[in-house]
């Protein structure tokens, strides 16, 4: 895993992707010495949450990624759909390391995730396969050298959409248009 370009992975449900995701990607590109950021939507949520169809979330990530040079989308978890460990970050990292032996990987996580790593499958393996980059989250202890991202959540965005409320400014414009055209997250 030495040498090569370092790719930062920003994983999540992206249900839907929002501007704080793009802020995290931009910050990693600008300050963490990574060549690219790959948005990595989970195929199936590891803790069983209901999600919009994978293809819709993948397309919303593609639309969001267009806003920033150096941000791309990785659908690797779909390649692992039949794997019983799909959605487990350690398994996804193993798959990507085998598929892209010329790359090094970093994993962008929010400060809120650090308190939950005991619940993760093989967090030790995740740390062995990727440099962990932590971004701050409002309402959590500060991370030295990292900005606190705004407290924007996909859960709140879905709730607002279900109530028919405006979410402009919280999600990229092209993502919002896609959500409206597809009728996603309506109550």
Curated annotation (Swiss-Prot):
Q: Which reaction does it catalyse?
A: nicotinate beta-D-ribonucleotide + ATP + H(+) = deamido-NAD(+) + diphosphate
SUPFAM superfamilies of this UniProt entry? Nucleotidylyl transferase (SSF52374)
**Keywords in UniProt for this one?**
ATP-binding, NAD, Nucleotide-binding, Nucleotidyltransferase, Pyridine nucleotide biosynthesis, Transferase
Q: Does the keyword Nucleotide-binding apply?
A: yes
Extract the CDD domains matched here: NMNAT
GO BP term (any one) = NAD biosynthetic process
The catalytic activity of this protein is classed by the Enzyme Commission as 2.7.7.18
User: TM segments?
Assistant: none
On whether NAD is a keyword of this UniProt record, the answer is yes
List the Gene3D superfamilies hit by this protein, alphabetically. HUPs
Specify the pathway: Cofactor biosynthesis; NAD(+) biosynthesis; deamido-NAD(+) from nicotinate D-ribonucleotide: step 1/1
A Gene Ontology molecular function term for this protein is: nicotinate-nucleotide adenylyltransferase activity
- Pfam families in UniProt: CTP_transf_like (PF01467)
Role noted for this protein: Catalyzes the reversible adenylation of nicotinate mononucleotide (NaMN) to nicotinic acid adenine dinucleotide (NaAD).
Which HAMAP family does the record match to this protein? NaMN_adenylyltr (MF_00244)
**Family according to the record:** Belongs to the NadD family.
Q: What is this protein called?
A: Probable nicotinate-nucleotide adenylyltransferase
At the highest ranks, the source species' classification is: Bacteria, Pseudomonadati, Myxococcota, Myxococcia, Myxococcales
